[in-house]
């Protein structure tokens, strides 16, 4: 209601636990088929969910610290993995941090000089690029941007409400 996108409120632990269980069941069936022996399957929703967090657990293991969420790739630490407001108070999202997508967009925007920032690690180093993208996307409406991005090799999507997403 406040005009900002929200998390989709997906039951993530249920989903990851279910996918882990499915994989375990299929492997157990294959083992039974090949060896005639069964398996005991013990699935933890917590463990299943933790296995899906490789993008945010790097600091925990590599640097022995808690992640700074706003600096992490999956939470907007990269300018090219963020959500931006448009002129009509709608939103667009970029989802490709690979250099080719950054190069394509920044070249089309006439700012290839920002590529060095785009390919730098996530975090505050991305702030100047985020500011540029924020200012750029706020110049036009969502409809304009959807048309502008058509047939461009850039990971872009409009942020839709649930009704729009189903239609």
Please give the residue ranges for each predicted region.
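Short, Lys/Arg-enriched charge-dense amphipathic segments
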Residues: 1, 59-70, 135-148, 166-167
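Active-site-adjacent "lid/gating" segments in soluble enzymes
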Residues: 1-96
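A generic structural signal for secondary-structure junctions
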Residues: 30, 57-58, 106-110, 167
């Amino acid at each position: 209601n406040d005009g900002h996108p929200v998390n989709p409120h997906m039951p993530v632990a249920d989903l990851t636990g279910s996918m882990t269980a499915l994989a375990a069941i299929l492997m157990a069936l294959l083992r039974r088929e090949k060896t005639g022996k069964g398996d005991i399957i013990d699935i933890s929703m917590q463990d299943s969910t933790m296995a899906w967090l490789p993008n945010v657990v790097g600091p925990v293991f590599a640097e022995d610290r808690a992640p700074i969420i706003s600096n992490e790739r999956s939470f907007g630490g990269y300018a090219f993995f963020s959500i931006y407001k448009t002129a009509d108070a709608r939103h667009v999202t970029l989802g490709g941090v690979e250099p080719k997508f950054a190069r394509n967009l920044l070249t089309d925007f006439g700012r290839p000089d920002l590529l060095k920032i785009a390919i730098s690690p996530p975090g505050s180093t991305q702030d100047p690029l985020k500011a540029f993208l924020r200012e750029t996307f706020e110049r036009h409406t969502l409809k304009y941007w959807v048309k502008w991005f058509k047939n461009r090799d850039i990971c872009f999507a409009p942020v839709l409400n649930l009704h729009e997403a189903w239609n």
